[in-house]
């Protein structure tokens, strides 16, 4: 491809609304163009990389015994009502009506459609197992699209669905997909982590996320350096500090003028934060909830939402807190009625806590769960953090940031039961099909690759997913010798099926080098009068600072060998 014919332009300025590195570099390199919030066009360079990623995905899916199909984007809302997932997805669903006033949604995922297909075409154990996948656009009305391709409203996704006759069959499908996903990321030249994850609105009994480690990632990865445990912070469990049990003392009300934050109250009363209880107020599907937790811990809102089995959870506003009769800054569950109290299990680990007196400017000493208040629900609703104790060894948690690029779920039978997707076993007994689902964000993977592979000058593409393998930088192309040499190398490489972007523009060396670094093509060949006078071509890998002069008569062989070594991942 001649750069002079390439559709798209680079830009020097960093767009003001681009926060993540991948968003900045994708826009600056002219690889994507925004149409509206969370909706992008893939320009030719980016689309070449997308196609390479999809090819790797297809190869690994097919190797794992999957069959590709294509399902409709338009879905009748009735199948979402049948599955019971219309409410959990809520406003994320794009709703529309056709000319006959029928309600439809744009598919955010395809569990409903594939389960409907399974109910029609799988009748016997002889029809199992099945593994079906597609690569297709999905639509989700994200409230705050951000990060370029990281969180968008229209995106490309590979979704695969497994159908098995037994839990052991599901385990096999799950492990096969786990290995296939790891192969995809490895072949794309990326470092990934597999972590425990929350199933969210998709549902299911177990799930894992695949993370590309990157400093600007939107997800927090909690892991133990001493053992193999790793999880999304939303899911992570940890060993909470054990407090000594004391003889229960009588409640005592004390004045705490102006002390509202836990840290201030603890300091004022000369106690440690873990010897206090704090209350956080939420609205769960419109119902007021008080969440109570030990003062040294924070609420994990995902765990809380799962415990409450609600579709919408948010912090209560000031007016809602007042309407509930709660005094912010001095609140506790002691003496409260007609309010749903949810407590973290840490409140049972300790005694004689300091908590709010439900009276402005006052707190209670010697508050004890069971004696002074009872929780309507009690479970682990605490957020793990760096420094938390690992529950599986004596290690201490560390944390990384990451970009989620894949999520796999053991769905079980809850969808097949709702859609009547059953099979008959060898004895003629009917059973619901056991399902798994496996998603991979293709556009996210592209962005994550940049998050993990860049420097201050631009992108550094891994060879397997680079839009082009070689960047020929011709300098002083008005010189006939340079022009002839550049054209000759370009044609010889293309004849060997090497993917080449030939910068044939009449621009300065500085502009060309800057664009080469920004675009991040893995291998750059610089052809100039000075290099030709020395009998060679400047050969440079994008990820290296050093370059070398390679003789003209061996440059093609050197390029081929380098591409092979860089692609063998």
Swiss-Prot record:
The keyword Nucleotide-binding is assigned to this record: yes
Q: Which UniProt keywords apply?
A: Aminoacyl-tRNA synthetase, ATP-binding, Cytoplasm, Ligase, Nucleotide-binding, Protein biosynthesis
Annotated catalysed reactions: tRNA(Pro) + L-proline + ATP = L-prolyl-tRNA(Pro) + AMP + diphosphate
Where is the protein found, in the record's own terms?
A: Cytoplasm
The EC code for this enzyme is 6.1.1.15
The answer to whether UniProt assigns keyword Repeat to this entry is: no
Question: One cellular component GO annotation, for this chain's record?
Answer: cytosol
Tell me which family the UniProt entry assigns to this protein: Belongs to the class-II aminoacyl-tRNA synthetase family. ProS type 1 subfamily.
Q: What is this protein called?
A: Proline--tRNA ligase
Organism of provenance: Dehalococcoides mccartyi (strain ATCC BAA-2100 / JCM 16839 / KCTC 5957 / BAV1)
Q: Lineage of this protein's species?
A: Bacteria, Bacillati, Chloroflexota, Dehalococcoidia, Dehalococcoidales
Gene that produces this protein: proS
